Amino acid sequence: MSLSVEAKAKIVSEFGRDAKDTGSSEVQIALLTAQINHLQTHFATHKKDHHGRRGLLRMVSRRRKLLDYLKRTDLAKYSETIARLGLRR
């Protein structure tokens, strides 16, 4: 259910400051968003996967906390990140 190495590398290069920047908030938010989108398609077909749904809710909560941190520290990057990812806020 995780993302492929190529997909992660593409996201890191797109949102990171350089090719090895995996720790910045923008990259972490983008990776979590990709995983969440992937899992949403999984739950469309596997409606009774309650254990997996708990993991999805943890990811959503973690993304929410990272977005709150980014908004608190750098409002311009926050606005740019949610616009590029198409998140509503």
UniProtKB/Swiss-Prot annotation:
<comment type="similarity">
    <text>Belongs to the universal ribosomal protein uS15 family.</text>
</comment>
<keyword id="KW-0699">rRNA-binding</keyword>
<protein>
    <recommendedName>
        <fullName>Small ribosomal subunit protein uS15</fullName>
    </recommendedName>
</protein>
<dbReference type="Pfam" id="PF00312">
    <property type="entry name" value="Ribosomal_S15"/>
</dbReference>
<dbReference type="GO" id="GO:0019843">
    <property type="term" value="F:rRNA binding"/>
</dbReference>
<keyword id="KW-0694">RNA-binding</keyword>
<comment type="subunit">
    <text>Part of the 30S ribosomal subunit. Forms a bridge to the 50S subunit in the 70S ribosome, contacting the 23S rRNA.</text>
</comment>
<dbReference type="GO" id="GO:0006412">
    <property type="term" value="P:translation"/>
</dbReference>
<keyword id="KW-0687">Ribonucleoprotein</keyword>
<comment type="function">
    <text>One of the primary rRNA binding proteins, it binds directly to 16S rRNA where it helps nucleate assembly of the platform of the 30S subunit by binding and bridging several RNA helices of the 16S rRNA.</text>
</comment>
<comment type="function">
    <text>Forms an intersubunit bridge (bridge B4) with the 23S rRNA of the 50S subunit in the ribosome.</text>
</comment>
<dbReference type="InterPro" id="IPR009068">
    <property type="entry name" value="uS15_NS1_RNA-bd_sf"/>
</dbReference>
<dbReference type="GO" id="GO:0003735">
    <property type="term" value="F:structural constituent of ribosome"/>
</dbReference>
<dbReference type="InterPro" id="IPR000589">
    <property type="entry name" value="Ribosomal_uS15"/>
</dbReference>
<keyword id="KW-0689">Ribosomal protein</keyword>
<dbReference type="GO" id="GO:0022627">
    <property type="term" value="C:cytosolic small ribosomal subunit"/>
</dbReference>
<dbReference type="InterPro" id="IPR005290">
    <property type="entry name" value="Ribosomal_uS15_bac-type"/>
</dbReference>
